[in-house]
């Protein structure tokens, strides 16, 4: 007999070799599975995530699930037991017991990624692991105008890095927001879609920054999307500025879907 637990996890991805377990590497999945193994006195408990973040990518809202053997432990006790053993660069923020038909990956309705990019002339030592860096002038209004071209249903082949295993490249992009944080001299970019291809957000960020810098026309994204060719976009933003912000398991709220008829 097992009980299925759904947990929300925040982590500083700097010192992890990504989410997925890899022999000899420190990973998110491997760290949680090792703690569960200790809690079950040696039993293997498989952890499933909503997605596999790369090395250096952070999370505010990663969601995992696992089936815990033996007697059911109250959710409040489970999160306390796990957090008491986690390293300081990880913390569970929510826990609930769910039905067995819930799956952290296959039940997803949408994902929200946020990217922070510092516009400082030189790399800020206190930001270097938590923001991307773009030391060139950008016109945020141009980036905001360009971002509108991403909304809707598109084939995002041009923004998928090699190495991905998903053949269907069509995604519904519900929401894109580009904002200037003047106090911290950063550009904050938010993306909400039904899902994202391998490195898609980082490639989109790099392309929007090129538009902001005048290296591409404002509406060049339309051409790049239509081309369905990865060679149209050569740059990929650094992993350190990317955050998995939220995972939706109900329909994405209308306030994030604007007037899209999707």
UniProtKB/Swiss-Prot annotation:
TM stretches of this protein: none
The UniProt record lists the EC number as: 5.4.99.12
Q: Which reaction does it catalyse?
A: uridine(38/39/40) in tRNA = pseudouridine(38/39/40) in tRNA
Recorded GO MF terms: RNA binding; tRNA pseudouridine(38-40) synthase activity
Question: SUPFAM superfamilies, alphabetically?
Answer: Pseudouridine synthase (SSF55120)
Which Gene Ontology terms describe the biological processes this protein takes part in?
tRNA pseudouridine synthesis
Q: What protein name applies here?
A: tRNA pseudouridine synthase A
Task: Look up and give the organism this protein is from.
Answer: Lactobacillus delbrueckii subsp. bulgaricus (strain ATCC BAA-365 / Lb-18)
| Gene name in the database record | truA
């Amino acid at each position: 007999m097992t009980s299925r637990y759904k947990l929300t996890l925040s982590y500083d991805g700097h010192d992890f070799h990504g989410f997925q377990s890899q022999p000899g590497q420190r990973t998110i999945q491997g760290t949680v599975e090792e703690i569960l193994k200790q809690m079950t006195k040696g039993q293997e408990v498989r952890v499933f995530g909503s997605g596999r973040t790369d090395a250096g990518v952070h999370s505010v809202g990663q969601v995992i699930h696992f089936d815990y053997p033996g007697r059911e432990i109250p959710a409040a006790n489970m999160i306390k037991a796990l957090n008491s053993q986690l390293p300081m660069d990880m913390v569970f923020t929510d826990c609930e017991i769910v039905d067995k038909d819930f799956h952290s990956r296959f039940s997803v309705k949408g994902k929200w990624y946020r990217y922070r990019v510092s516009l400082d002339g030189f790399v800020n030592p206190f930001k270097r692991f938590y923001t991307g860096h773009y030391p060139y002038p950008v016109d945020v209004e141009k980036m905001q105008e360009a971002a509108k071209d991403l909304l809707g249903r598109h084939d995002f082949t041009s923004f998928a890095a090699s190495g991905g295993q998903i053949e269907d490249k069509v995604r519904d992009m519900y929401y894109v927001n580009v904002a200037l944080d003047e106090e911290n001299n950063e550009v904050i970019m938010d993306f909400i879609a039904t899902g994202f291809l391998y490195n898609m957000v980082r490639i989109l960020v790099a392309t929007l920054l090129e538009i902001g810098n005048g290296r591409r026309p404002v509406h060049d994204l339309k051409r790049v999307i239509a081309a369905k060719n990865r060679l149209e976009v050569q740059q990929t933003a650094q992993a350190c500025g990317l955050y998995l912000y939220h995972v939706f398991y109900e329909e994405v709220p209308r306030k994030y879907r604007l007037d899209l008829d999707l």
